[in-house]
Amino acid sequence: MDQDVLKKQVAEAALRFVPEGDIIGVGTGSTANFFIDALATLKDRIKGTVASSEATAERLKQHGIEVFSLNDVGSLSVYVDGADEVNQHREMIKGGGGALTREKIVAAMAKEFICIVDGSKQVNRLGAFPLPIEVIPMARSYVARKLVALGGQPQYREGFLTDNGNIILDVHNLDISNPIELETTLNNIVGVVTNGLFAKRPADIVLVGEKSGAVNQY
């Protein structure tokens, strides 16, 4: 089954977690885009959304779905987003699209985090996908040296700036045997805004679109 079909299928399955009359958080990326398209069918049943990126906000508005500033919202009942990798503990690597900081903020606000993926994103151990780290531009070289000292191989994502005006270092070959510990260690490096490990705040529910046509939940 085509990967886009799987993404569409799992995105539509996430609609059952959308409470009527609430403001919900919406993620960024290809699978999240399928969720936005599906959410448009329910737009009259929700109060609105909070977007984790400018691109997501634009797509929501194109569907006529209201987008609120997170600063105007006290809490979110649910946040729906994809992942680049997810393990059996529902810990994730996110940020392939560069929206990791805003995604992490919206996830922190949400009572329930629903992660939607196709089966190719499930892993036993995180780290085959390079770990994105958002960095203040002037700290790029300093942070890169610190990452090398931790055993990583940082690669500057050239020509890309986040919605916050920062740069991304994609780090290969990090030992992610303890995701919670590494998430904290990386965030303690001066100049790092945040990293793409979602371990301290993992997903509450993972929905997986399988090639068989089934959507599994764990």
UniProtKB/Swiss-Prot annotation:
Gene3D superfamilies, alphabetized: 3.30.70.260, 3.40.50.1360
Reactions accelerated catalytically: aldehydo-D-ribose 5-phosphate = D-ribulose 5-phosphate
Pathway: Carbohydrate degradation; pentose phosphate pathway; D-ribose 5-phosphate from D-ribulose 5-phosphate (non-oxidative stage): step 1/1
A GO biological-process term: pentose-phosphate shunt, non-oxidative branch
Cellular component GO terms, alphabetical: cytosol
Described function: Catalyzes the reversible conversion of ribose-5-phosphate to ribulose 5-phosphate.
Name of encoding gene: rpiA
Signal sequence extent: none
The family this protein is said to belong to: Belongs to the ribose 5-phosphate isomerase family.
Keywords assigned: Isomerase
Enzyme class: isomerase
Identification of the protein by name: Ribose-5-phosphate isomerase A
HAMAP family: Rib_5P_isom_A (MF_00170)
SUBUNIT field: Homodimer.
EC number, UniProt record: 5.3.1.6
Source taxon at top rank: Bacteria
Keyword Cell inner membrane: no
Residues of the active site: 103 (proton acceptor)
Family matches, as Pfam families: Rib_5-P_isom_A (PF06026)
InterPro entries: NagB/RpiA_transferase-like (IPR037171), Ribose5P_isomerase_typA_subgr (IPR020672), Ribose5P_isomerase_type_A (IPR004788)
Binding site for substrate: 28-31, 81-84, 94-97, 121
